[in-house]
């Protein structure tokens, strides 16, 4: 078991290499395939559903090959997009913001929302952790440094005067893939974790964890973008028709999920099992996951810009919301 190696600073290095001044790149060309990235998470339910039902492939037609790229954290997905290995993807707002700024706005844009909510702080069995205030001196996992849950955790800590050890504080923030977090909770090697669904619900059931903070309680009206849809700018410029068709498929899956969560949940569970080589999610885990996650394409721009402000405040970025005028493209909605 290993923690994920790619983090915010490797992302920054990658950007410098790819977007340095004077760096030439080939002109955008019409595509005969599209690489779609997403996570095996409930917050990416629309992607899981569209992939499993053939929605993406049907939308673009037989002449365009749809290839799936599966990730467990956003910074690694952004690195793949920088390397032109991803064209269209589902990701948390944190890595999308980082990628946009580090590429001087050249690499990507957000064109829709995929989920609101669906992230929480949980504590390992037997730990006396009732709130974020109790994390001092504790070992807390996030999917990846610089990712959306990492930013949320560090912001919550800073708000009460705490910080990670890497910033001179006492909280040991470590990065692990969610599946590894489950094993570490079972072995008692972690105190807490800030994770997306279905891992929150699964670890509560399978490892006896307790829910400490549902992140929705920290946001106005309980709404914030947990997952957004991004597109590689060069791909979108050369293939606006493909992007429009994929967005139609995305929204169709969002609508299908909300129309019948039981049926859609079964499809999504099987897809997660297929991708993670694990078992399907039980009905109670699915129900709990969906109860904390709103699968939606509602515009939640303010929350995305708030993540930018938080990332700046944490020292991840040099600019806050004022540096992201072209990040969210409503014209592509």
PLM features: what roles do these ranges have?
Residues 1-12:
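Bacterial N-terminal signal peptides that target proteins for export
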Residues 19-22:
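C-terminal motif of bacterial Sec signal peptides marking the signal peptidase cleavage site
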Residues 24-26:
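Bacterial signal peptide processing site
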Residues 28-175, 191-197, 213:
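Short, glycine-/small- and polar/acidic-enriched structural segments
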Residues 54-64, 217-221, 290-300:
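Short, solvent-exposed loop/beta-turn-alpha elements that line the ligand-binding surface or hinge
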Residues 104, 127, 167-170, 174, ...:
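Pocket-lining segment of extracytoplasmic ligand-binding domains
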Residues 236-316:
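Secondary-structure end/capping motifs
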Residues 308-333:
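Conserved C-terminal helix/tail region of periplasmic/extracytoplasmic solute-binding proteins
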